Structure formats: structure tokens, C-alpha cells
Amino acid sequence: MNNLFFLLGVAAVVVMLFTFDVSFVELWQHLCHAGYWLIPIVGVWILIYGMNALSWQTIIRSKCKEAKVSFWRIYRLTITGYALNYATPVGGLGGEPYRIMELSKDIGNQRATSSVILYAMMHFFAHFWYWFSSIFIYLALAAVGDLPINTAIGTLLGIVIVFCLIAFYIFSKGYRHGLVTKVIRWLGHVPGLRKWSARFQENHAEALHNIDEQIAALYAEDKRAFYRSLLLEYLSRVVQSSEVMFMLLLFGIDCGGGFSGLLITFLHSFLIVSFTTLFANLIGFLPMQLGVQEGGFVLSIAALGLSAALGIFVSIICRVREIIWILIGILLMKIDKK
């Protein structure tokens, strides 16, 4: 099974290399333009994945205090899991089965399943808080005249607020009562899956109940771990904004320079990442979100009054960074040290 995931990752890299929207000559020109800035652009993800791993480790230790899973192992599974998420046909989901399979060797299948589900929930929960907070950042920048505001933009922001509030309600129900059993039951309404759903619930009723209990227990019994994990995931999104800021600075876009100029540039980067990730996650079923991320960057950067060419450059460099980290992830898959 490990080799299957490895081959999937390799195939994904090949596909990504041949699905760039520019020729290899143009790609090389973009890379040359990025120059030494590629080092912090790629390197900042060492910190981002480290924060993700700490968030997941917090959940694992809360669920299984006697478990002796090293931070390096969690860090490795974090990077590899995200590499597979980029690569799989069901974008954003492929890494979870691999994480469960590997972590089961350390803490057992049920605890591994609940911890991976809890971390995936936390990952998306933090996304919604990131999108929610970006609305108020946009409004603050609009209030000082830095960004436009009109009826269309106000309506769009209102829709996002409602979307996030609905998500907060769903997550609160999931964290209080568990959601695995409900998801399996809901799948029974999908044509062709009714018999499978009923059979799965019947054969695994006790395991599903135990996993849901473990999910609900995190918030009910260890709120400190819950909020620490959430904060780490949220802050990792904030740090991710620096990746785009590096590229804006590369083009000399610093909003006048100085502390205030750099702060506004960072907030612009925050909004660019927020819109792009929202756009990509809404259409997350595409493998490697091909074309979606690129479109998100171009639209979000253009909305801030910057050139579409800059949006294309940012999307290409981010795609290169993804390929580099997918390669790192699939290589780490071959490292079995715990």
C-alpha cells in the first residue's frame, strides 16, 4: 500500500509538470525572475508544516497521552499527507488514508482514525476562521480608502459571512457529538451507496461509535488542547500569507515602504491567499486543483488593482513550490524511522 501511495505521488508530479499553462521556456524565465526569492518562498513552508504538525501532535497527545509518537514522525506524516492531498483525484482527501494507515502502527486504528479526522476537521475549521477574519481586514482597508467597497463587493462579503457562520454551526455540532456516523448515514442517500452505507454501519457500529466519542471528547474534556490546535492551524495560514508577500516585494510592490507599507502589503497578501484558498476549496474535487488555484490568484490579485501578469507569476511559482514539496513528501514516504 505504501508503494501505491508513492507511485501516485510520482504520477502527480509528472502530470503537474506537463499541465503548466506556460511553456518550459517561459517557466524557466519565471524561475530566473524569482531568483533567490525562491529560497524563502519554498523555505517558509518548513515553518508552516511545522505548525501543522504541532497542531496535530496536540490532538494526538490529548487523545492518547501514553502514545510515544515523535514529533519528527508526525512532521513527516504531515508533509507526506499534504503531498498526497495535492496529488489525488479527490483533491484534498488523499493524504488522510495514508496518515491513518501509518499512525495506526503507533496508536491503533481507532485512535489513529479519530485523530486524523479531528485534525482534518481542525484544518478546515481554521480555514473558515481565516476566511471570516479576512472579511474584517478587507472592511478595515476599505474604511481607510485602500480598497474599493460597493454594493456588489458588500453582497459578496455578506454571502461569505453567512457561509462561514453556517460552517461554524456545523463544526460545533460535529465537535460536540461526533460526525462520522452521520456522514456514513448521509452517504446512504447517494445513489448506489445505500446498501454499502447500511452494511458498513451494521458491521462497524461499535467502531464508529467509539470514533465519534473520541472526536467529541477533545472539545468536552480538553478545551485547552482544542484551542491550542486551532490557534496553531490559524497562525499557519497567517504565515502562509508571507509567501505571497515575498512575491509582491520581488515586483517592488511594498505600498510605499516602511513599516506601514509592509503591513498593508502583508494584509493584501492575507486577502489574496484567503480568496484563492476559498475559491480552490469550493472546487476541491479537482486533482491538484488544476487551473483553480491559478484562476484564484489571478482574480484575487486583479481585484486588488494589480496586474493579471503578476497573478500568473504568483500562481506559477506557487505551483513550482507545490511540486518541490510533493517530491519531498513522496521521498519522506520511503523513510521508515519513527
Annotated model-derived regions:
Residues 131-145, 303:
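Transmembrane alpha-helix termini and helix-breaking/packing motifs in multi-pass membrane transporters
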Residues 83-90, 271-294:
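Transmembrane alpha-helix interface/packing and boundary motifs in multi-pass membrane proteins
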Residues 1-79, 148-280, 312-314, 321-338:
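Predominantly cytoplasmic-facing regulatory/coupling regions of multi-pass membrane proteins
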Residues 71-73, 106-121, 307-317:
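Membrane-interface alpha-helices at helix entry/exit sites of multi-pass transporters
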Residues 52, 56, 88-93, 123-134, ...:
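Alpha-helical transmembrane segments and their lipid-water interface positions
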Residues 201, 284-287, 297-317:
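Hydrophobic alpha-helical transmembrane segments in multi-pass integral membrane proteins
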